[in-house]
UniProtKB/Swiss-Prot annotation:
BP GO annotations: ribosome biogenesis
Name this protein carries in UniProt: GTPase Obg
Domain OBG-type G: 161-339
Alphabetical list of NCBIfam families matching this protein: Obg_CgtA, Obg_CgtA_exten, PRK12296.1, PRK12297.1, PRK12299.1, small_GTP
């Protein structure tokens, strides 16, 4: 049996930008050639791409680390490094993407060919050509490439189907799907024969078509994780119409009406919005003895429990998946209902990460933090400060002096002095150590 994987956490790391170069023009008859170090190339992004042929996240079972290539370093004679190609990671349609640490929604990928950048590549470092000025016409200053974005993301697959077949185990959902489509799900006379969602394309007698999904059987407590639990309840979220399949034969000693209430309770417990979707009750196994009697009793109980006398009655279609009796009217009614039912947005209250740039003042957190270690050294940290540190090329004295000026401009010296730092104290940024000088 092919394995079905519908939730996975992966690590993505974009490519680092290429380093800028310190170089000078050295040619015969050009005594004052000046700086000639080129810029580094842009690092590659990590991009998710929807691939229509994929149906599961199985490809991520053994490969969960994705790293884009860095940009090319700058070269002499003013030549810039080449930007790296993006790393394309294929995902099936219906994949939602979240930040694993914050839980924030990054994107919802549903259309073939749709792309989503999940990690941005770093920009290339500037070569010494960029730092030339009248005051310093021959600078020995160049930047390292900017680090690429690194993050953990969660991929969650929710199958794309117009119609979802729900019900208790062994009520005949898989048999029904095999009859109305070309899908060939595993069918057996025991509970939980279906362990993965099965998709099938259904065509009605008048030529209309829709996608239907046979979802694994639910049991009481599924919304709290009992049985197959929430693992497959999520797949119902994308459906527009629910076919609620009920075993009317009562052969296992079950009450059809109690089954109906129990399944609806699980749907509501998982997500209240599932109850907004229109339902069609499929009274299955009508070829069995006592099925007619059970159906009449079911209709009686359903009418008795109606709270709104003006609400439309739920459509009930008696069928037999084995003899195929009543199948055609059911499919036509389902297609009719789909034509008037809109799509239900999955994430109305959540804001998807935007790729557009908004200009304007945005208050930021502190640019750096200072901590005191037990060995009396000082540790500097902070996203902006660490980024400056990583983009500094310490092989050239001028670049080191520039970094010192940047720290002073950020107020690091003043803050250290205010915390009690004295001449000769050790200051650390990452693995780098230097002495504090007043």
């Amino acid at each position: 049996m092919s394995m079905f994987l519908d939730q996975v956490t992966i690590d993505v790391k974009a490519g680092k930008g290429g380093d800028g170069m310190v170089a000078f023009r050295r040619e015969k008859y050009v005594p004052d050639g000046g700086p000639a170090g080129g810029d580094g190339g842009r690092g590659g992004d990590v991009v998710l791409v929807v691939e229509e042929g994929l149906r599961t996240l199985m490809d991520f079972r053994f490969n969960r680390h994705f790293k884009a290539t860095p940009g090319e370093n700058g070269m002499s004679k003013g030549m810039h490094g080449r930007g790296s190609e993006d790393l394309l990671v294929k995902v099936p349609p219906g994949t939602t993407v979240r930040d694993a640490e914050t839980g924030a929604l990054i994107g919802d990928l549903i259309e073939n060919g749709q792309t989503l950048v999940v990690a941005k590549g770093g920009r290339g470092g500037r070569g010494n050509i960029r730092f030339a000025s009248p005051r310093n016409p021959a600078p020995e200053i160049a930047e390292n490439g900017e680090p690429g974005q690194e993050r953990k993301i969660e991929l969650e697959l929710k199958v794309l189907a117009d119609v979802g077949l729900v019900g208790f185990p062994s009520v005949g959902k898989s048999t029904l799907l095999s009859v109305i489509s070309s899908a060939r799900p595993k069918i057996g006379a025991y509970h939980f024969t279906t362990l993965v969602p099965n998709l099938g394309m259904v065509t009605t007698s008048d030529g209309r078509s829709f996608a239907a999904a046979d979802l694994p059987g639910l049991i009481e407590g599924a919304s709290q994780g009992v049985g197959l639990g929430t693992q497959f309840l999520r797949h119902i979220e994308r459906t527009r119409v629910i076919l609620h399949v009920i075993d009317m034969s009562g052969m296992e000693g079950r009450d059809p009406y109690e089954d109906y209430l129990a399944i609806n309770k699980e749907l509501a417990s998982h997500n209240l919005r599932l109850m907004e979707r229109p339902q069609i009750i499929v009274a299955n196994k009508m070829d069995m003895p006592e099925a007619e009697e059970n159906l009449a009793k079911f209709k009686e109980q359903l009418a008795k429990e109606r709270t709104d006398e003006y609400a439309d009655e739920l459509p009930i279609f008696p069928i037999s998946g084995v003899t195929r009796k009543g199948i055609e009217p059911l499919l036509n009614a389902t297609a009719d209902l789909l034509e008037v039912t809109p799509e239900f947005p999955l994430y109305e209250d959540e804001v998807v990460e935007e790729e557009t740039v908004r200009y304007g003042f945005q208050p930021e957190g502190p640019e750096f933090t200072i901590d005191r270690e037990p060995d009396a050294s000082w540790v500097l940290s902070g996203e902006k400060l660490e980024k400056l540190f990583e983009m500094t090329n310490f092989d050239h004295d001028e670049t080191v002096m520039r970094f010192a000026r940047q720290l002073r401009g950020m107020g690091v010296d003043e803050a250290l002095r205010a915390r009690g730092a004295k001449d000769g104290d050790i200051v650390r940024i990452g693995n780098f150590e230097f002495e504090f000088v007043e």
